[in-house]
Amino acid sequence: MAMKARLESVLNVGLRIPSIMLLEVLYRWDVSSFFQKIQRSSLNNNPVFQYKYIALYLHYVGYILSLVLLTLPRQHLVQLYLYVLTALLLFAGHQLSRDYVRGELDSGYEGPLYLEPLSMNRFTTALIGQVVVCTLCSCVMQTRQIWLFSAHLLPLVARLCLVPLETIVFINRFAMIFTGLEVLYFIASNLLVPYNLAKTAYRELVQVVEVYGLLALGMSLWNQLVLPVLFMCFWLVLFALQIYTYFSTRDQPPSRERLLFLFLTSIAECCSTPYSLLGLVFTVSFVALGVLTLCKFYLQGYRAFMNDNAMHRGMTEGITLLILAVQTGLIELQVIHRAFLLSIILFIVVASILQSMLEIADPIVLALGASRDKSLWKHFRAVSLCLFLLVFPAYMAYMICQFFRMDFWLLIIISSSILTSLQVLGTLLIYVLFMVEEFRKAPVENMDEVIYYVNGTYRLLEFLVAVCVVAYGVSETLFGEWTVMGSTIILVHSYYNVWLRAQLGWQSFLLRRDAVHKIQSMPTASTLQLQQHNDICSICFQDMKSAVITPCSHFFHAACLKKWLYVQETCPLCHGQLKSQLQPTSSPGTPTQGTPAANQNPREVEQEQRQPQVELNTEEGIRAEEMKTSAEQKLGMDLLPGSLNTQPKECDLVAEGSAGTASNLKGDDYYDDDDVSTSDVNCAS
């Protein structure tokens, strides 16, 4: 079943290539120049060529026929090709019969065949050929009525029966007329088939559009026709024919420089029409996809195909080629100018492929450096690919400077190559830092700061390169030749590579600066608070020997919280906005008014603030406290969840000017010690 599906896929593509070939030929065929040549030749008196408009209509009929062949379903397309093959076989049988009759007329021998060796050889050859033609026709048409295709055997039978040669000529004509009538009958019997197919196709298209819409219809046709593979195969066939035509007309093999020129000119010849240009676009897309797939396989092996990234499909390179070709009018240029411009466009495509390779390799290399993988082969593959991406773009920029005169387009290519090399250099430096930290026994302090400075350095260099490109483009526009395309490229380059990069870098700097200020403004937890908290950092899941306390009373490592604040301004646990909660404090360990104390639940503080404050150094305070305590004991109220768990204490409350008795209160203290003065409360533990 898999083999059958593959064969059907190959047939689906291969049988549609002639339709695009026909479109290519019709586009290249200049009808007006064709009729001018006919008028200057002897064919001008031919009545067929007197009706020029009929030929023009046939030209448009060819377009319709090619579109029908392109969109016809595979089953009907196979049947159509079988019918065409049968017609060609019948024509071959007619040619064999005509050649045999001419040979017999030239010899003039009318006697028995076995007496003349030459006549016997001609007869045997013609008989074998006609039998093969009849057999193939019956097999192709899947019928056992082989006599339908054996009309051209009549001249052979007549010659075997010693019929005169003049009569054999008429018999051959009768065989030709009989075969032609068969073909006409077959065409007439299937005359309504195209109409029925068009009617069915229209009804299905209307149903699909009503249910799913035009977009779904376009996607369905795209998948059924396999247009990218179809245009790629068409362009490869066209390119192979161009190379074959060149080498078939040359006796000596070309030199190395000539081969490069031949390669560029052949590509330029094969993109002179919109159809061949689309074929080149899809071919470049598939080549880019193959290169990126090999890059993934080289880095990760078969694991790369498990988590395939939809972003690296090679479509970016193909779309880049198409946009540049359309904007520069590539198909309207001469072959030499087209080859020169195409070389520059291909350099841009190669630079885009290198950038995509870097996007694939960068996270893999950094993850490999941060992990503890000891496989030398993995590290060798990652580092070797990075070294290639470091050296090759620089070499390509050097070659461009050597062979081309500098202009804005070439400066964009060179800047892209330099940026790729800079990014690879930054990736390698970070990888080296990770490996140094791995081999050291103690971790490197402020490693994130070092990595940030490395990234910031090459980002700054990228920004400077982009600014230089924009400055050169503006100067060339002001003092050189002004074009709409050049100005558009400058604006797009200025927005994406200058303004957005500057804005992103400035935002990153502000986030880091605000994070440092926030960490400095937060109180530091004391040793007692850390012991009472007795928890790990929720970011790194490690024990805390030192920590800072957020306004929402959560404990974190200062370094971990700073890294978190580099990205967002919320608490990692409660996701509250730290920016709005931060307020200036009087001292690092003292909570301000409205701010909960360290290691204290905000809900408890809020409930305490709602309750009236009670003075305990008066008789009313003691009575209120006793009433509150007795009420809590009767109702069985527990402490609020999240309050501090302290050891039970036995307190003697002594009030001045009263004869109150001592009450032994055993249990958890509801209030902190700060709420009761030491002169009024004596606690005996």
From Swiss-Prot:
Keywords for the protein's UniProt record, in alphabetical order: Membrane, Metal-binding, Transmembrane, Transmembrane helix, Zinc, Zinc-finger
Biased composition (Basic and acidic residues): 620-631
Membrane-spanning intervals of the chain: 53-73, 77-97, 123-143, 151-171, 174-194, 225-245, 275-295, 316-336, 340-360, 384-404, 410-430, 460-480, 482-502
Topology within the bilayer: Multi-pass membrane protein
Keyword Cytoplasm: no
Chain intervals with Low complexity compositional bias: 583-602
Subcellular location: Membrane
Segments for region (Disordered): 582-685
UniProt zinc finger (RING-type) residues: 537-575
Gene Ontology terms: biological process: ERAD pathway; hemopoiesis; myeloid cell development; proteasome-mediated ubiquitin-dependent protein catabolic process
Matching Pfam families: TRC8_N (PF13705), zf-RING_2 (PF13639)
Domain of life: Eukaryota
InterPro entries the UniProt entry points to: HRD1_E3_ubiq-ligases (IPR050731), RNF145_RING-H2 (IPR047823), TRC8_N_dom (IPR025754), Znf_RING (IPR001841), Znf_RING-CH (IPR011016), Znf_RING/FYVE/PHD (IPR013083)
Gene3D superfamilies for this protein: Zinc/RING finger domain, C3HC4 (zinc finger)
Coarse class of the protein's main subcellular location: membrane
CDD domains associated with the record: RING-H2_RNF145 (cd16684)
GO terms assigned for molecular function: ubiquitin protein ligase activity; zinc ion binding
PANTHER family: RING FINGER PROTEIN 145 (PTHR22763:SF167), RING ZINC FINGER PROTEIN (PTHR22763)
Protein name: RING finger protein 145
